[in-house]
């Protein structure tokens, strides 16, 4: 399945919530009407079946983290095999992706931009270049911008944008050095309450 390259706000309208696909700090609902579906007439969303609600939640989370369908299913399988709460395990796997950590640290304005930075070999983990967006970051790993990439305007712009947002408590970033420490694996209480991972578990359990 190809990665979606169309309008970002259209996806957020489809899911009825901000998917954090844009780089600005302004609330997305000031730019578009989230209560109506995308399209010329923007028809109001119809009530979904139980399956439809579960499917929408899965699509929402998949799009937030920018993961393809096959990758997402594999993450779910890994989460189900891991001891503990399957839904929380799934979110942990998504949060520890390198592209997501780069975004959380503010080196990329969006997860999509952060994924590009990783793919273009602009990011290092513990002093070594890593160009795999799905690379799993572990607690106490140090993530940094490669020295020759530190002059990139988009990275500087992203840091300026991230300075207006509150940094997650599980990362510690030195903007001057363009370096951050992934202090710990985030707990469920650290993450968005607008995600209902149990719906995803119910969907895949059928």
UniProtKB/Swiss-Prot annotation:
Q: What does this protein do?
A: One of the primary rRNA binding proteins, it binds directly to 16S rRNA where it nucleates assembly of the body of the 30S subunit. With S5 and S12 plays an important role in translational accuracy.
Q: Any S-S bridges, and between which cysteines? A: none
Annotated GO CC locations: small ribosomal subunit
> S4 RNA-binding domain: which residues?
96-156
- Keyword RNA-binding belongs to the record: yes
**What PROSITE patterns would the database entry show?**
RIBOSOMAL_S4 (PS00632), S4 (PS50889)
GO terms assigned for molecular function: rRNA binding; structural constituent of ribosome
Name the Gene Ontology biological process terms: ribosomal small subunit biogenesis; translation
| Gene3D superfamilies per the UniProt record, alphabetical | Ribosomal Protein S4 Delta 41, Chain A, domain 1, RNA-binding S4 domain
Subunit annotation: Part of the 30S ribosomal subunit. Contacts protein S5. The interaction surface between S4 and S5 is involved in control of translational fidelity.
What taxonomic ancestry is recorded?
Bacteria, Pseudomonadati, Pseudomonadota, Gammaproteobacteria, Alteromonadales
Pfam entry (one)? S4
Keywords for this entry? Ribonucleoprotein, Ribosomal protein, RNA-binding, rRNA-binding
Query: Which protein is depicted?
Result: Small ribosomal subunit protein uS4
Family affiliation: Belongs to the universal ribosomal protein uS4 family.
Keyword RNA-binding on entry: yes
